[in-house]
Amino acid sequence: MSSSDARDFLRILAPAMAQAAAIAAALEGRVPNVRKPGAETEVKAALTIADTAAQEALLIPLAIAFRDARLEAEEDTSSVALFTGRDARRRIVIDPIDGTLHFYLGGLGPYAVMAGLAEDARYEGALVALPREGFLFQARRGEGARRRRLPAGRFETASVGHGGAGLLLSDGVPDAVAERLRARGFEVGRGCGGAVAIAPLLPGVRGGMRVAKSDTISTRGRIGLLIAAEAGARIETGNGEPFPTAIDAPADTLVVASDAEIARELRAALAP
């Protein structure tokens, strides 16, 4: 993949991400959950018209420039068929609303709109929008991270923050871990996996943690890690090992932190 591929991916998708985020925000609280048949869990089964509309807003602009890429889309919408998958080295991963059940419908915390472009199983370009918080983040490998306010702010450099006491945990992190962190003086909230991946870039938030509900954190759940890494975040497993950059490599825990001290606090709470 040439560097221009990731550049084109971001250029094409940035306005589409803003549109998808606007769709999700406009329909929030107005759409019912229509369970997908055959799904293994209630979380995987959750589906709204906002999911399908937001996904189409993302796929249609990509269908010409990236038609031959292998597409991994969360929903089975009509534009999925436009992608041939001939170039298996290039993978586009889309999640139009990450956290549909608990975070979009349930309001437990931030939900996200996400898209990533990978070559040889490593993300080269990534975008994550948080509609409720009003931010769009993007990054290209080796060129830093940027963010802008939704719907139409100007992009600026994004970096990790070192103020505040906020932490964002996925719903897979046990309540006991959250309570240990609160006892240490942190302000603990819950968020979808996409939001946790970029947690240290959010105002007042120092870090985030995920514990996979299945064997490993999904490829979708890793999209934001490129953005976090380019912004200077510390990214580890719950054991303190470097989190793998290969998007298919097994890893069932994730710690994302603004600095080494916050990473230690998160790891200690996970394994007291």
Model-identified regions with their sequence ranges:
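N-terminal subdomain of lithium-sensitive/metallo-dependent phosphomonoesterases centered on the IMPase/IPPase/PAP
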Residues: 1-97
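Residue-level signal for inorganic ion chemistry
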Residues: 20, 24, 51, 62, ...
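Short, charged helix-to-loop "capping" segments that act as catalytic/coupling loops
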Residues: 37-41, 81, 98-112, 203-223
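Short coil/turn connectors at secondary-structure junctions
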Residues: 67, 87-89, 123, 164, ...
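Fold-independent oxyanion-binding glycine-rich loops
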Residues: 74-75, 96-97, 131, 171-172, ...
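DPxDG-like acidic metal-binding loop motif
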Residues: 83-146
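Short helix-loop capping/hinge motifs at secondary-structure junctions, enriched
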Residues: 144-147, 151-153, 261-265
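An extended, acidic
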Residues: 157-272
